[in-house]
Amino acid sequence: MIKKLLRVTLVIGLLLLASCTPETEYTHAIPKNASVVIGMEVDDMVHKAGLNGQEGEKVLTQLKALVKGGLQGEASQLAERIIDQPSESGLSFNDKVYLFATPHAEAFGILAKVSDEGKLETLIEMLEKESIASPLREESGCQWTEAGTALCAFNNGTFLLLQPSRGNASTMKGTLLSLMRQKEGEGFCALPEFQKIEVEGNDMASVMNLSAIPHEMTTPLRMGLSADIRLEDIKYFITANFESGKVVVNSESLIQNPRILSFFDTMDQVIQPIQGKYLDYYQGNTLIWAGGKITGKELYHILSFNPTIKQKLDNPPLPVDVESIFSSIQGDIAIGFDRKSSKKFLFYADVTNSDFLKTFEDLRPLLALTGGQITLDNVGSHDYMMDTYYGKYWFGVKNNRLYVTTDRTWAEEVGRTYGVSIGRKPWASEVKTNRLYASLNMAEIPKYRTKVTGDSSIDYAINFLRGSCVFLNVSMTDWRHGKAELVLKDKDTNFLEWLVSILKK
Protein backbone atom coordinates (compact mmCIF):
# COMPACT_ATOMS: atom_id res chain seq x y z
CA MET A 1 0.00 0.00 0.00
CA ILE A 2 2.82 2.40 0.92
CA LYS A 3 4.56 1.67 -2.39
CA LYS A 4 1.35 2.42 -4.28
CA LEU A 5 0.86 5.73 -2.49
CA LEU A 6 4.50 6.59 -3.15
CA ARG A 7 4.00 5.97 -6.86
CA VAL A 8 0.91 8.21 -6.87
CA THR A 9 2.93 10.98 -5.23
CA LEU A 10 5.80 10.55 -7.66
CA VAL A 11 3.48 10.54 -10.67
CA ILE A 12 1.86 13.77 -9.46
CA GLY A 13 5.35 15.21 -9.02
CA LEU A 14 6.19 14.24 -12.59
CA LEU A 15 3.10 16.05 -13.80
CA LEU A 16 4.58 19.28 -12.48
CA LEU A 17 7.30 19.12 -15.12
CA ALA A 18 4.84 19.49 -17.99
CA SER A 19 4.22 22.49 -20.28
CA CYS A 20 0.96 24.40 -20.76
CA THR A 21 -0.93 26.73 -23.03
CA PRO A 22 -1.51 30.38 -22.05
CA GLU A 23 -5.21 29.73 -21.27
CA THR A 24 -6.10 30.05 -17.60
CA GLU A 25 -9.68 28.71 -17.34
CA TYR A 26 -8.50 26.00 -14.98
CA THR A 27 -8.02 28.60 -12.24
CA HIS A 28 -11.82 28.85 -11.91
CA ALA A 29 -11.72 25.61 -9.88
CA ILE A 30 -9.97 27.17 -6.86
CA PRO A 31 -12.54 27.45 -4.04
CA LYS A 32 -13.52 31.03 -3.24
CA ASN A 33 -13.16 30.46 0.50
CA ALA A 34 -9.67 28.91 0.23
CA SER A 35 -7.58 29.83 3.27
CA VAL A 36 -4.30 29.21 1.41
CA VAL A 37 -3.59 29.50 -2.32
CA ILE A 38 -0.07 28.99 -3.68
CA GLY A 39 0.97 29.59 -7.27
CA MET A 40 4.20 27.88 -8.39
CA GLU A 41 6.32 28.72 -11.45
CA VAL A 42 7.28 25.10 -12.00
CA ASP A 43 9.21 25.64 -15.23
CA ASP A 44 11.48 28.26 -13.62
CA MET A 45 11.97 26.12 -10.53
CA VAL A 46 12.92 23.07 -12.61
CA HIS A 47 15.50 25.21 -14.42
CA LYS A 48 16.90 26.59 -11.16
CA ALA A 49 17.10 23.07 -9.76
CA GLY A 50 19.40 22.15 -12.64
CA LEU A 51 17.12 19.39 -13.89
CA ASN A 52 17.51 20.43 -17.53
CA GLY A 53 21.22 19.61 -17.87
CA GLN A 54 23.43 16.55 -17.51
CA GLU A 55 23.07 16.52 -13.74
CA GLY A 56 19.32 16.59 -14.24
CA GLU A 57 19.53 13.48 -16.42
CA LYS A 58 21.19 11.62 -13.55
CA VAL A 59 18.33 12.59 -11.24
CA LEU A 60 15.73 11.53 -13.80
CA THR A 61 17.50 8.19 -14.25
CA GLN A 62 17.25 7.59 -10.50
CA LEU A 63 13.61 8.71 -10.61
CA LYS A 64 12.84 6.24 -13.39
CA ALA A 65 14.21 3.37 -11.34
CA LEU A 66 12.15 4.43 -8.32
CA VAL A 67 8.87 4.99 -10.18
CA LYS A 68 9.13 1.91 -12.37
CA GLY A 69 9.89 -0.38 -9.44
CA GLY A 70 7.15 -3.00 -9.47
CA LEU A 71 5.53 -1.73 -12.70
CA GLN A 72 5.26 -4.11 -15.62
CA GLY A 73 4.78 -3.91 -19.40
CA GLU A 74 2.82 -0.89 -20.69
CA ALA A 75 2.73 0.77 -17.27
CA SER A 76 6.52 0.70 -17.03
CA GLN A 77 6.89 2.05 -20.58
CA LEU A 78 4.39 4.86 -19.96
CA ALA A 79 6.14 5.89 -16.74
CA GLU A 80 9.44 6.12 -18.62
CA ARG A 81 7.86 8.18 -21.43
CA ILE A 82 6.39 10.65 -18.93
CA ILE A 83 9.75 11.12 -17.23
CA ASP A 84 11.48 11.65 -20.58
CA GLN A 85 8.67 13.83 -21.99
CA PRO A 86 6.34 15.19 -19.29
CA SER A 87 3.75 16.32 -21.87
CA GLU A 88 2.97 12.60 -22.32
CA SER A 89 1.11 12.87 -19.01
CA GLY A 90 -1.55 15.00 -20.69
CA LEU A 91 -0.83 17.83 -18.27
CA SER A 92 0.87 21.09 -19.04
CA PHE A 93 2.35 23.44 -16.41
CA ASN A 94 4.69 26.03 -17.87
CA ASP A 95 2.53 28.75 -16.32
CA LYS A 96 1.58 27.85 -12.79
CA VAL A 97 0.65 24.92 -10.62
CA TYR A 98 -1.74 25.85 -7.81
CA LEU A 99 -1.88 24.34 -4.35
CA PHE A 100 -4.68 25.28 -1.98
CA ALA A 101 -6.21 24.48 1.39
CA THR A 102 -9.78 24.94 2.57
CA PRO A 103 -10.57 26.65 5.92
CA HIS A 104 -9.19 24.93 9.02
CA ALA A 105 -7.09 22.63 6.80
CA GLU A 106 -10.03 20.30 6.21
CA ALA A 107 -8.89 19.52 2.65
CA PHE A 108 -5.95 20.17 0.33
CA GLY A 109 -5.90 20.48 -3.43
CA ILE A 110 -3.62 20.55 -6.48
CA LEU A 111 -4.81 22.29 -9.64
CA ALA A 112 -3.23 22.11 -13.09
CA LYS A 113 -3.98 22.68 -16.77
CA VAL A 114 -4.89 19.74 -19.02
CA SER A 115 -3.23 19.87 -22.43
CA ASP A 116 -4.29 16.45 -23.75
CA GLU A 117 -7.32 14.78 -22.19
CA GLY A 118 -6.64 11.50 -24.01
CA LYS A 119 -3.11 11.16 -22.65
CA LEU A 120 -4.28 11.96 -19.13
CA GLU A 121 -7.02 9.35 -19.45
CA THR A 122 -4.39 6.80 -20.50
CA LEU A 123 -2.33 7.68 -17.43
CA ILE A 124 -5.30 7.21 -15.09
CA GLU A 125 -6.13 3.87 -16.72
CA MET A 126 -2.55 2.75 -16.13
CA LEU A 127 -2.90 3.67 -12.45
CA GLU A 128 -6.13 1.67 -12.37
CA LYS A 129 -4.38 -1.43 -13.72
CA GLU A 130 -1.80 -1.07 -10.95
CA SER A 131 -4.67 -0.89 -8.41
CA ILE A 132 -3.62 2.65 -7.50
CA ALA A 133 -6.78 4.31 -8.85
CA SER A 134 -10.41 3.25 -9.20
CA PRO A 135 -12.11 3.00 -12.63
CA LEU A 136 -12.87 6.37 -14.26
CA ARG A 137 -16.45 7.61 -13.89
CA GLU A 138 -18.10 10.40 -15.85
CA GLU A 139 -20.26 12.99 -14.10
CA SER A 140 -21.00 16.74 -14.24
CA GLY A 141 -19.05 17.22 -17.44
CA CYS A 142 -15.83 15.62 -16.19
CA GLN A 143 -14.24 12.29 -15.40
CA TRP A 144 -13.19 11.43 -11.87
CA THR A 145 -11.44 8.67 -9.95
CA GLU A 146 -10.38 7.79 -6.43
CA ALA A 147 -6.63 7.36 -5.99
CA GLY A 148 -5.53 6.30 -2.53
CA THR A 149 -6.77 8.90 -0.06
CA ALA A 150 -7.49 11.50 -2.75
CA LEU A 151 -10.04 12.21 -5.47
CA CYS A 152 -9.02 13.35 -8.96
CA ALA A 153 -11.20 14.94 -11.63
CA PHE A 154 -10.40 16.29 -15.09
CA ASN A 155 -11.97 17.59 -18.28
CA ASN A 156 -10.55 19.12 -21.44
CA GLY A 157 -8.96 22.01 -19.54
CA THR A 158 -8.70 21.31 -15.82
CA PHE A 159 -7.07 18.71 -13.58
CA LEU A 160 -8.02 18.83 -9.88
CA LEU A 161 -6.80 16.61 -7.06
CA LEU A 162 -8.57 16.95 -3.70
CA GLN A 163 -7.59 15.21 -0.47
CA PRO A 164 -9.35 15.49 2.91
CA SER A 165 -7.16 15.88 5.99
CA ARG A 166 -9.14 13.13 7.69
CA GLY A 167 -11.88 10.67 6.81
CA ASN A 168 -12.72 8.92 3.56
CA ALA A 169 -11.88 10.55 0.22
CA SER A 170 -15.33 9.70 -1.16
CA THR A 171 -16.91 12.24 1.22
CA MET A 172 -15.30 15.00 -0.88
CA LYS A 173 -17.00 13.94 -4.13
CA GLY A 174 -19.69 16.64 -4.00
CA THR A 175 -17.10 19.35 -3.31
CA LEU A 176 -14.84 18.05 -6.09
CA LEU A 177 -17.56 18.12 -8.76
CA SER A 178 -18.86 21.48 -7.54
CA LEU A 179 -15.41 23.04 -7.96
CA MET A 180 -15.08 21.54 -11.44
CA ARG A 181 -18.35 23.26 -12.42
CA GLN A 182 -17.29 26.73 -11.25
CA LYS A 183 -17.33 29.48 -13.87
CA GLU A 184 -15.60 32.84 -14.17
CA GLY A 185 -16.33 35.04 -11.18
CA GLU A 186 -17.33 32.15 -8.89
CA GLY A 187 -13.98 31.02 -7.48
CA PHE A 188 -10.94 32.48 -5.76
CA CYS A 189 -9.66 33.88 -9.05
CA ALA A 190 -12.45 36.49 -8.90
CA LEU A 191 -10.90 38.04 -5.77
CA PRO A 192 -8.42 40.94 -6.11
CA GLU A 193 -5.72 39.14 -4.12
CA PHE A 194 -5.54 36.43 -6.80
CA GLN A 195 -4.05 39.00 -9.17
CA LYS A 196 -1.08 39.40 -6.80
CA ILE A 197 -0.35 35.68 -7.17
CA GLU A 198 -0.52 36.04 -10.96
CA VAL A 199 2.14 38.76 -11.13
CA GLU A 200 5.32 37.29 -12.62
CA GLY A 201 8.72 37.41 -10.96
CA ASN A 202 8.31 35.03 -8.00
CA ASP A 203 9.05 31.32 -7.91
CA MET A 204 6.20 30.84 -5.47
CA ALA A 205 3.49 33.32 -4.50
CA SER A 206 0.67 32.75 -2.07
CA VAL A 207 -2.22 34.38 -0.25
CA MET A 208 -3.13 32.93 3.12
CA ASN A 209 -5.27 33.86 6.10
CA LEU A 210 -5.53 32.60 9.66
CA SER A 211 -8.63 30.52 8.95
CA ALA A 212 -6.11 27.96 7.66
CA ILE A 213 -5.40 27.01 11.27
CA PRO A 214 -7.10 23.76 12.41
CA HIS A 215 -10.21 24.16 14.58
CA GLU A 216 -8.53 22.89 17.74
CA MET A 217 -5.95 25.69 17.57
CA THR A 218 -8.31 28.60 16.93
CA THR A 219 -9.70 29.01 20.45
CA PRO A 220 -6.47 30.26 22.09
CA LEU A 221 -5.81 32.38 19.02
CA ARG A 222 -9.17 34.14 19.26
CA MET A 223 -8.88 34.87 22.98
CA GLY A 224 -9.10 38.61 23.46
CA LEU A 225 -9.97 39.34 19.83
CA SER A 226 -12.88 41.69 19.19
CA ALA A 227 -16.07 39.95 18.02
CA ASP A 228 -15.99 41.86 14.72
CA ILE A 229 -12.54 40.49 13.81
CA ARG A 230 -12.64 37.23 11.87
CA LEU A 231 -9.65 34.96 11.28
CA GLU A 232 -10.27 35.47 7.56
CA ASP A 233 -9.55 39.18 8.05
CA ILE A 234 -5.94 38.50 9.00
CA LYS A 235 -4.37 37.66 5.65
CA TYR A 236 -0.99 38.01 3.98
CA PHE A 237 0.65 37.85 0.57
CA ILE A 238 3.80 35.73 0.78
CA THR A 239 6.44 35.07 -1.88
CA ALA A 240 9.41 32.70 -1.99
CA ASN A 241 12.33 33.02 -4.38
CA PHE A 242 15.19 30.56 -4.74
CA GLU A 243 18.47 32.34 -5.43
CA SER A 244 22.16 31.49 -5.52
CA GLY A 245 23.11 30.45 -2.02
CA LYS A 246 19.80 31.31 -0.37
CA VAL A 247 16.02 31.28 -0.31
CA VAL A 248 14.21 34.54 0.43
CA VAL A 249 10.62 34.75 1.73
CA ASN A 250 8.80 38.10 1.82
CA SER A 251 5.43 38.86 3.38
CA GLU A 252 3.02 41.75 2.89
CA SER A 253 -0.12 42.39 4.93
CA LEU A 254 -3.44 42.37 3.07
CA ILE A 255 -5.42 43.28 6.19
CA GLN A 256 -8.30 45.71 5.59
CA ASN A 257 -10.22 45.44 8.88
CA PRO A 258 -10.31 49.01 10.37
CA ARG A 259 -9.81 47.80 13.95
CA ILE A 260 -6.70 45.81 13.06
CA LEU A 261 -5.33 48.63 10.90
CA SER A 262 -5.75 51.08 13.76
CA PHE A 263 -4.02 48.72 16.19
CA PHE A 264 -1.00 48.15 13.97
CA ASP A 265 -0.69 51.84 13.11
CA THR A 266 -0.41 52.45 16.85
CA MET A 267 2.17 49.66 17.16
CA ASP A 268 4.25 51.39 14.48
CA GLN A 269 4.60 54.30 16.91
CA VAL A 270 5.47 52.03 19.84
CA ILE A 271 7.91 49.72 18.02
CA GLN A 272 10.37 51.91 16.13
CA PRO A 273 13.41 51.40 13.84
CA ILE A 274 16.32 49.81 15.71
CA GLN A 275 19.37 51.97 16.43
CA GLY A 276 21.65 48.93 16.69
CA LYS A 277 23.22 49.91 20.03
CA TYR A 278 23.72 46.36 21.24
CA LEU A 279 25.18 44.65 18.18
CA ASP A 280 28.71 44.83 19.61
CA TYR A 281 27.62 43.61 23.05
CA TYR A 282 27.28 40.01 21.84
CA GLN A 283 29.99 37.66 20.60
CA GLY A 284 29.99 36.64 16.95
CA ASN A 285 29.33 32.98 17.82
CA THR A 286 26.06 33.81 19.64
CA LEU A 287 23.50 31.16 18.69
CA ILE A 288 20.39 33.37 18.60
CA TRP A 289 20.26 37.17 18.59
CA ALA A 290 17.15 39.33 18.47
CA GLY A 291 16.65 43.06 18.77
CA GLY A 292 14.09 45.84 18.60
CA LYS A 293 13.30 49.34 19.82
CA ILE A 294 10.26 50.04 21.97
CA THR A 295 8.51 52.64 24.05
CA GLY A 296 7.73 50.45 27.05
CA LYS A 297 5.02 52.52 28.71
CA GLU A 298 2.87 52.71 25.57
CA LEU A 299 3.49 49.03 24.83
CA TYR A 300 2.25 48.08 28.31
CA HIS A 301 -0.95 50.07 27.84
CA ILE A 302 -1.61 48.51 24.43
CA LEU A 303 -1.06 44.99 25.76
CA SER A 304 -3.40 45.74 28.65
CA PHE A 305 -6.31 46.20 26.25
CA ASN A 306 -6.27 42.42 25.74
CA PRO A 307 -8.07 40.87 28.76
CA THR A 308 -6.02 37.66 28.65
CA ILE A 309 -2.68 39.47 28.54
CA LYS A 310 -3.80 42.01 31.14
CA GLN A 311 -4.61 39.22 33.57
CA LYS A 312 -1.08 37.85 33.22
CA LEU A 313 0.48 41.31 33.59
CA ASP A 314 -1.58 41.99 36.70
CA ASN A 315 -0.77 38.60 38.22
CA PRO A 316 2.91 37.79 37.52
CA PRO A 317 4.61 34.75 39.15
CA LEU A 318 6.18 37.16 41.66
CA PRO A 319 4.24 40.23 42.89
CA VAL A 320 6.39 42.88 41.20
CA ASP A 321 5.23 46.11 39.57
CA VAL A 322 5.34 45.02 35.93
CA GLU A 323 4.04 48.40 34.72
CA SER A 324 6.94 50.28 36.32
CA ILE A 325 9.44 47.93 34.66
CA PHE A 326 7.83 48.39 31.23
CA SER A 327 7.55 52.16 31.71
CA SER A 328 11.29 52.51 32.36
CA ILE A 329 12.22 50.98 28.99
CA GLN A 330 12.74 53.54 26.25
CA GLY A 331 14.93 52.58 23.29
CA ASP A 332 16.79 49.55 21.98
CA ILE A 333 16.34 46.08 23.46
CA ALA A 334 18.30 42.93 22.59
CA ILE A 335 18.68 39.33 23.72
CA GLY A 336 21.28 36.70 22.89
CA PHE A 337 21.41 32.96 23.63
CA ASP A 338 24.63 31.03 24.08
CA ARG A 339 25.61 28.42 21.51
CA LYS A 340 26.16 25.72 24.15
CA SER A 341 23.05 26.16 26.26
CA SER A 342 19.66 27.63 25.42
CA LYS A 343 19.23 28.40 29.15
CA LYS A 344 22.19 30.80 29.06
CA PHE A 345 21.09 34.23 27.84
CA LEU A 346 21.86 37.94 28.15
CA PHE A 347 19.20 40.63 27.80
CA TYR A 348 19.76 44.39 27.47
CA ALA A 349 17.32 47.30 27.35
CA ASP A 350 17.70 51.08 27.36
CA VAL A 351 16.03 52.51 30.47
CA THR A 352 15.32 56.05 31.62
CA ASN A 353 15.87 55.28 35.33
CA SER A 354 16.42 52.51 37.86
CA ASP A 355 13.51 53.38 40.17
CA PHE A 356 11.65 50.21 39.22
CA LEU A 357 14.27 48.14 41.09
CA LYS A 358 12.50 49.14 44.31
CA THR A 359 9.74 46.68 43.40
CA PHE A 360 12.28 43.88 43.93
CA GLU A 361 13.39 45.33 47.28
CA ASP A 362 9.75 45.17 48.34
CA LEU A 363 9.82 41.40 47.72
CA ARG A 364 12.23 40.67 50.56
CA PRO A 365 9.59 40.07 53.31
CA LEU A 366 7.71 37.68 51.01
CA LEU A 367 10.88 35.82 49.96
CA ALA A 368 11.81 35.36 53.61
CA LEU A 369 8.71 33.18 53.96
CA THR A 370 10.01 30.69 51.35
CA GLY A 371 12.54 29.26 53.80
CA GLY A 372 15.46 30.01 51.50
CA GLN A 373 13.94 28.40 48.43
CA ILE A 374 13.97 31.80 46.72
CA THR A 375 16.60 34.36 47.72
CA LEU A 376 17.50 37.88 46.59
CA ASP A 377 21.04 39.17 47.16
CA ASN A 378 22.62 42.54 46.40
CA VAL A 379 25.77 42.15 44.28
CA GLY A 380 26.23 45.87 43.53
CA SER A 381 24.65 49.27 44.05
CA HIS A 382 21.93 48.54 41.48
CA ASP A 383 22.64 44.85 40.90
CA TYR A 384 20.97 41.70 42.20
CA MET A 385 21.17 37.92 42.07
CA MET A 386 17.95 35.97 42.53
CA ASP A 387 18.18 32.24 43.23
CA THR A 388 14.91 30.49 42.28
CA TYR A 389 13.49 27.03 41.64
CA TYR A 390 14.46 27.44 37.98
CA GLY A 391 18.01 28.68 38.44
CA LYS A 392 19.97 31.84 39.18
CA TYR A 393 19.32 35.21 37.58
CA TRP A 394 21.54 38.28 37.69
CA PHE A 395 19.92 41.60 36.89
CA GLY A 396 20.30 45.30 37.46
CA VAL A 397 20.94 48.67 35.83
CA LYS A 398 24.32 50.03 34.69
CA ASN A 399 24.80 53.18 32.63
CA ASN A 400 21.07 53.41 31.87
CA ARG A 401 21.04 49.82 30.65
CA LEU A 402 18.85 47.15 32.20
CA TYR A 403 20.44 43.73 32.02
CA VAL A 404 19.22 40.22 32.86
CA THR A 405 21.35 37.10 32.51
CA THR A 406 21.64 33.53 33.77
CA ASP A 407 25.45 33.56 33.67
CA ARG A 408 27.68 34.94 36.46
CA THR A 409 30.56 35.82 34.12
CA TRP A 410 28.29 37.73 31.77
CA ALA A 411 26.86 39.57 34.78
CA GLU A 412 30.35 40.57 35.90
CA GLU A 413 31.18 41.75 32.37
CA VAL A 414 27.97 43.70 31.72
CA GLY A 415 28.61 46.49 29.23
CA ARG A 416 31.54 44.70 27.59
CA THR A 417 31.84 45.00 23.80
CA TYR A 418 33.56 42.44 21.57
CA GLY A 419 35.90 42.84 18.62
CA VAL A 420 34.44 39.78 16.91
CA SER A 421 30.81 40.61 17.56
CA ILE A 422 27.35 40.37 16.04
CA GLY A 423 28.10 43.82 14.62
CA ARG A 424 30.65 42.21 12.26
CA LYS A 425 28.10 39.89 10.68
CA PRO A 426 27.31 40.50 6.98
CA TRP A 427 23.68 41.19 7.89
CA ALA A 428 24.41 43.64 10.72
CA SER A 429 23.86 46.69 8.50
CA GLU A 430 20.29 45.52 7.83
CA VAL A 431 19.33 45.69 11.51
CA LYS A 432 18.96 49.49 11.55
CA THR A 433 16.46 49.41 8.66
CA ASN A 434 14.05 47.22 10.64
CA ARG A 435 11.81 47.45 13.69
CA LEU A 436 12.36 43.82 14.68
CA TYR A 437 15.28 41.58 13.73
CA ALA A 438 16.25 38.03 14.74
CA SER A 439 19.05 35.74 13.60
CA LEU A 440 19.74 32.05 14.15
CA ASN A 441 23.43 31.21 13.67
CA MET A 442 23.01 27.81 11.99
CA ALA A 443 26.75 27.06 12.06
CA GLU A 444 26.76 27.34 15.87
CA ILE A 445 24.00 24.84 16.60
CA PRO A 446 25.83 22.48 18.99
CA LYS A 447 27.41 19.80 16.84
CA TYR A 448 27.59 17.37 19.71
CA ARG A 449 23.84 17.47 20.35
CA THR A 450 21.93 15.06 18.13
CA LYS A 451 18.81 15.72 20.20
CA VAL A 452 18.08 19.43 19.99
CA THR A 453 14.31 19.64 20.54
CA GLY A 454 13.39 16.08 21.50
CA ASP A 455 11.22 15.72 18.37
CA SER A 456 13.04 13.23 16.11
CA SER A 457 11.79 14.70 12.82
CA ILE A 458 12.65 18.28 13.83
CA ASP A 459 16.02 17.19 15.19
CA TYR A 460 16.79 15.40 11.92
CA ALA A 461 16.02 18.56 9.94
CA ILE A 462 18.13 20.73 12.27
CA ASN A 463 21.11 18.36 12.12
CA PHE A 464 20.78 18.26 8.35
CA LEU A 465 20.61 22.04 7.91
CA ARG A 466 23.33 23.04 10.36
CA GLY A 467 26.01 21.41 8.23
CA SER A 468 24.97 23.29 5.08
CA CYS A 469 23.53 26.63 6.24
CA VAL A 470 25.10 29.78 7.67
CA PHE A 471 22.14 31.61 9.19
CA LEU A 472 18.38 32.07 9.21
CA ASN A 473 17.28 35.69 9.63
CA VAL A 474 13.77 37.07 10.18
CA SER A 475 12.98 40.80 10.10
CA MET A 476 10.17 43.36 9.95
CA THR A 477 10.52 46.84 8.46
CA ASP A 478 7.00 47.67 9.69
CA TRP A 479 3.85 45.75 10.54
CA ARG A 480 2.96 45.45 6.86
CA HIS A 481 6.20 43.91 5.62
CA GLY A 482 8.37 41.04 6.81
CA LYS A 483 11.25 38.98 5.45
CA ALA A 484 12.93 35.63 6.15
CA GLU A 485 16.21 34.52 4.61
CA LEU A 486 17.97 31.14 4.85
CA VAL A 487 21.57 31.38 3.62
CA LEU A 488 23.77 28.45 2.54
CA LYS A 489 27.51 28.03 2.99
CA ASP A 490 27.68 27.44 -0.78
CA LYS A 491 27.06 30.94 -2.18
CA ASP A 492 27.33 29.96 -5.87
CA THR A 493 24.73 27.19 -6.13
CA ASN A 494 21.02 27.93 -6.42
CA PHE A 495 19.11 26.80 -3.34
CA LEU A 496 16.96 24.39 -5.38
CA GLU A 497 19.99 22.92 -7.13
CA TRP A 498 21.60 22.39 -3.72
CA LEU A 499 18.42 20.69 -2.50
CA VAL A 500 18.38 18.35 -5.50
CA SER A 501 22.06 17.48 -4.92
CA ILE A 502 21.18 16.49 -1.35
CA LEU A 503 18.30 14.31 -2.56
CA LYS A 504 20.62 12.56 -5.02
CA LYS A 505 22.80 11.45 -2.14
Predicted features and spans:
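Sec-dependent bacterial lipoprotein signal peptides
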Residues: 1-18
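Active-site acidic/histidine clusters and adjacent loop/turn architecture
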Residues: 106, 349-350
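Flexible loop/turn segments at secondary-structure boundaries
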Residues: 296-299, 355-356, 410-413
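Beta-propeller and related beta-repeat scaffolds in trafficking/envelope systems
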Residues: 358-385
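Short, hydrophobic/aromatic-enriched beta-strand segments in well-ordered soluble domains
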Residues: 112, 164, 251-256, 400, ...
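Short, surface-exposed ligand-recognition loops at beta-strand->loop->(often short) alpha-helix junctions
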Residues: 112-116, 350-356
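Structural boundary/hinge residues at secondary-structure and domain interfaces
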Residues: 20-132, 138-146, 189-239, 243-343, ...
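An internal, short helix-loop-strand segment that often contains or flanks glycine-aspartate motifs
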Residues: 56-95, 128-244, 315-319, 379-480, ...
